[in-house]
């Protein structure tokens, strides 16, 4: 939606949604300044740029994000005011070298947004309006390796918790339940335990294989993304082919149930085939997009689920 780009919330959503899955940045205490800085490549240039194109109603649009960092001397009182602590001006103020950032968003050469942020804008918002964050979750292909899950949402939903256990039987047929180790939690992360018929005591989830951890990560991420957007990179990694149908079917059906827009990527022909065919009742809700290079451009080919299956099965066309 082009109008969405014009809103100040678009910047906060972009910064928050893109960095919330980064280790240590899931806390909302990080400022927009810190998150926007993280979006751009680290280089020696003072001005950084992100550019992308998209097609809407047969018209190609170009979006450019420009970031420029610079420093200004501010008094200690001004800094404290920016942080929301005090409006009082002190008689002897220390001067502080403060980093600022100008962020501009252009659409087709026309300026949509021009905002200024400071490293001390911890709590400030434009015009005291409340930021409307879109519930967006990004799952990288290796996130399960760090035992980083979204299980707090799962444990608060009895119905989906039971459904998830039914799927996890594919990895451990003796699994009984999953809970939080109240003694083993740290300030940054909860420790989760698996109850199994094979063991007298609960086993830490981190001791299980990558397949179990990846399945739990994907399913918990779906539940955490209710009424939002879920992006999964290389969704099939660490999932054995024998378990793909059940897991993918649950993910897709639950995404529909919870009103989630789901984007998944893969380079695996077998995984793409599995996800397209795992639940025929959902095939009218799926599209396959293939990115490919032509000359100096990256182009997109869109196929419906039915077209993609026909292309693979009847004509042996490469859809990856």
Predicted regions and their residues:
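C-terminal lobe/lid and adjacent interdomain/linker elements of RecA-like ASCE P-loop ATPase modules
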Residues: 246-320
């Amino acid at each position: 939606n082009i109008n969405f780009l014009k809103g100040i919330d678009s910047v906060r959503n972009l910064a928050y949604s893109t960095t919330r899955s980064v280790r240590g940045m899931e806390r909302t205490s990080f400022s927009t300044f810190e998150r926007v800085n993280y979006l751009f490549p680290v280089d020696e240039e003072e001005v950084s740029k992100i550019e992308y194109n998209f097609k809407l109603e047969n018209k190609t649009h170009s979006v450019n994000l420009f970031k420029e960092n610079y420093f200004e001397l501010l008094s200690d009182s001004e800094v404290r005011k920016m942080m929301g602590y005090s409006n009082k001006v002190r008689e002897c103020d220390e001067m502080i070298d403060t980093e600022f950032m100008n962020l501009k968003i252009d659409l087709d050469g026309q300026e949509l947004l021009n905002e200024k942020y400071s490293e001390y804008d911890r709590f400030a918002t434009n015009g005291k309006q409340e930021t409307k964050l879109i519930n967006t979750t990004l799952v990288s292909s290796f996130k399960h390796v760090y035992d980083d899950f979204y299980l707090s949402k799962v444990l608060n939903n009895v119905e989906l918790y039971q459904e998830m256990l039914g799927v996890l039987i594919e990895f451990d047929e003796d699994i009984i339940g999953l809970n939080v180790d109240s003694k083993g939690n740290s300030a940054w992360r909860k420790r989760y335990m698996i109850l199994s018929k094979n063991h007298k005591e609960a086993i830490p989830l981190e001791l299980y294989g990558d397949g179990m951890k990846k399945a739990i990560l994907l399913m918990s991420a779906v539940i955490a993304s209710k009424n939002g957007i879920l992006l999964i990179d290389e969704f099939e990694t660490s999932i054995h082919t024998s378990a793909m149908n059940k897991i993918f079917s649950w993910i897709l059906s639950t995404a529909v149930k919870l009103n989630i827009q789901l984007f998944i990527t893969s380079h695996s022909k077998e995984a793409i085939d599995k996800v397209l065919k795992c639940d025929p009742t959902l095939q009218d809700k799926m599209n396959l997009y293939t990115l490919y290079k032509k000359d100096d451009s990256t182009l997109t080919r869109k196929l419906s689920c039915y077209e993609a299956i026909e292309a693979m099965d009847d004509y042996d066309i490469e859809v990856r």
